[in-house]
């Protein structure tokens, strides 16, 4: 990096900003040198639709991010998700920036098609030149079909049905990426021992604690929707032992390992885990399991934080790893967290876990399979090419972040301090900084 000034001011990057109520009734005010460039809050009196679009940073390309459809949507949440997309796309080396959309309602209690049409109509001037949508919580490939038709441009979103040239997220691209991130992390730990890499004592202890057969490594997954269920499937393919999964309704656990293919078949016509038939006791559960049938005991959903496991994968909503749950994970021997969800860990919980030698693979690295697949769809390429590119990019990005974390460690401090999020974030920021400077007309950066 040369002596070109990288400390950009708001006037440097915000000349085209169209901010609508960036400090709302909830007191939210989030503007920094990175963005957001635009915050749109929209309302349609005919349908009652209320929505939010945050275009955070487009220096590397049009803003990319899904449309979340939920009662809990707030401008602050949408901004945080948009910012995560900025780092995610930069880390993955994609020609996209960061953005996110949100519709504020329970999709089961409104006319989802009409509300999606209304939202698309309201933000049409920005699609696809500044914003390219995708699915998220509460939206599916059919919503993307509606969105694209209303915008009048198939390039306005990804995750469309295959009949429209899409690569639906329902194929499991995000979950596959999470499994690749975990596999790469486990391979990295093996390399430490095999290659004799210099590492701190806690990191060596972590390596030794996971030096066992794949089917002896215990994994729990919080969330069993699209991301969580496919993560479980692909981890099962790697012969890892998934001992528990949860959703909003409950927690299914078997210390001997769940039959994931059977569980996915049993869930094919159900909307939540509590719809499964509960067994009376563990003996009955094991008996049915031996007969290739399964009877499930449904525990309280928060019990997932209280069971012994090696690896914890949050694959649902934001903020589930917090000051209350992080100590429970540590108490129950969690050694690695792979963030399948966006922003699942609060900053204070993240610091607490890192300080206590838990290795965290951050969301913008681990769950980038979805947006990588979106990029392949945007280029008009195939499903196979999507999975191949996810494999290639996430393997290399996670490996680079892990090795850079070792090299950045204070050699005088024999503690783990393997803060992958911090190291990977710095890399992403450098990429975005360079793009911002080039947009300003910098000749040498």
Predicted segments with their positions:
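Glycine-rich phosphate/diphosphate-binding loop of Rossmann-like nucleotide-binding domains
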Residues: 169-308
